[in-house]
Amino acid sequence: MAHKKGQGSSRNGRDSNPQYRGVKVYGGETVSAGSILVRQVGTVIHAGANVKLGRDFTLYSVVDGVVKYERLGRDRKKVSVYPAAAEQASA
């Protein structure tokens, strides 16, 4: 029998915290200014109208309004927030 415990149990037992990335608000939903729309690594989705890009590539709304996901060229996506008053007037 081994008189030492071995290295298996002492080297295990760690796990990193989850990052909670992804789309937080979907198209057609209403948001208030400062609401986080997408958490991402790099610009998977680009900032459109009334949307800013945070230091960690988080996209957030600058105005109150309705979220819309759109194409940006052939292979890119962008998210925009259009003010609710303008959205109701066009509907």
From Swiss-Prot:
User: Which keywords does this chain's UniProt record carry?
Assistant: Ribonucleoprotein, Ribosomal protein
Top-level division of the source organism's lineage: Bacteria
Report the Gene3D superfamilies cross-referenced here. 2.40.50.100
Cellular component GO terms held in the UniProt record:
cytosolic large ribosomal subunit
Instruction: Tell me yes or no: is Lipid biosynthesis among this UniProt entry's keywords.
Output: no
A Gene Ontology biological process noted in the UniProt record is:
translation
Q: Where is this region: Disordered?
A: 1-22
Which residue stretches does the UniProt record annotate as biased composition, category Polar residues?
7-19
MF GO annotations: structural constituent of ribosome
Q: Which InterPro entries match?
A: Ribosomal_bL27
| Entry's family note | Belongs to the bacterial ribosomal protein bL27 family.
Name of the protein in question: Large ribosomal subunit protein bL27
**Which organism is this entry from?**
Myxococcus xanthus (strain DK1622)
**What's the gene?**
rpmA
